[in-house]
């Protein structure tokens, strides 16, 4: 089982799919990584040689921000917005949608379960 960026890749999947188990790597990024490393995308992850794993690992370390570093950057960006007090930061702080979605109805994912108000009728 190959271990890249602190993640154990699943054994029986194609390496193109297995790389997407790493936070910050999707399908297109995994295809680019494999093309630069010169590894066939259809190879199963348990059939990779040590040199291929080393090439992939080196390519990811050099070109892609993944896992902890990426999570830290995202949280620092959100914290920066909240410290600035800009509109997006206020929306993050209040736990409301940030990208202009409606909130009179819907937005339940961001707002949480509905809290009924006593005495409010149509």
From Swiss-Prot:
**This protein's UniProt keywords:** Ribonucleoprotein, Ribosomal protein, RNA-binding, rRNA-binding, tRNA-binding
State a single Pfam family of this protein: Ribosomal_S13
Any single biological process term in GO: translation
Q: Where is this region: Disordered?
A: 96-122
Q: Which Gene3D superfamilies match?
A: 1.10.8.50, 30s ribosomal protein s13, domain 2
PROSITE patterns with a match to the protein in the record: RIBOSOMAL_S13_1 (PS00646), RIBOSOMAL_S13_2 (PS50159)
InterPro entries xrefs: Rbsml_uS13_C (IPR027437), Ribosomal_uS13 (IPR001892), Ribosomal_uS13-like_H2TH (IPR010979), Ribosomal_uS13_bac-type (IPR019980), Ribosomal_uS13_CS (IPR018269)
Statement: the UniProt record of this protein carries the keyword rRNA-binding: yes
Q: Which GO terms describe its molecular function?
A: rRNA binding; structural constituent of ribosome; tRNA binding
Example GO CC term: the record gives: cytosol
Q: Which family does it belong to?
A: Belongs to the universal ribosomal protein uS13 family.
Q: What does this protein do?
A: Located at the top of the head of the 30S subunit, it contacts several helices of the 16S rRNA. In the 70S ribosome it contacts the 23S rRNA (bridge B1a) and protein L5 of the 50S subunit (bridge B1b), connecting the 2 subunits; these bridges are implicated in subunit movement. Contacts the tRNAs in the A and P-sites.
Q: How does it assemble?
A: Part of the 30S ribosomal subunit. Forms a loose heterodimer with protein S19. Forms two bridges to the 50S subunit in the 70S ribosome.
Which HAMAP family does UniProt cross-reference here?
Ribosomal_uS13 (MF_01315)
- Its name, as the record gives it, is Small ribosomal subunit protein uS13
Q: What is the lineage of its organism?
A: Bacteria, Pseudomonadati, Thermodesulfobacteriota, Desulfuromonadia, Geobacterales
């Amino acid at each position: 089982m190959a271990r890249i960026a602190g993640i154990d890749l699943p054994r029986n999947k194609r390496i193109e799919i297995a790389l997407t188990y790493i936070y910050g790597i999707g399908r297109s990024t995994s295809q680019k990584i494999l093309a630069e490393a010169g590894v066939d995308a259809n190879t199963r992850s348990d059939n990779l040689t040590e040199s291929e794993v080393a090439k992939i690992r080196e390519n990811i370390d050099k070109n892609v921000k993944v896992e902890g570093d990426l999570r830290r950057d995202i949280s620092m960006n959100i914290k920066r917005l909240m410290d600035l007090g800009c509109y997006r930061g206020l929306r993050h702080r209040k736990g409301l949608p940030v990208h202009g979605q409606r909130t009179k109805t819907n937005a339940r994912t961001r707002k949480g379960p509905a809290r009924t108000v006593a005495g409010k009728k149509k």
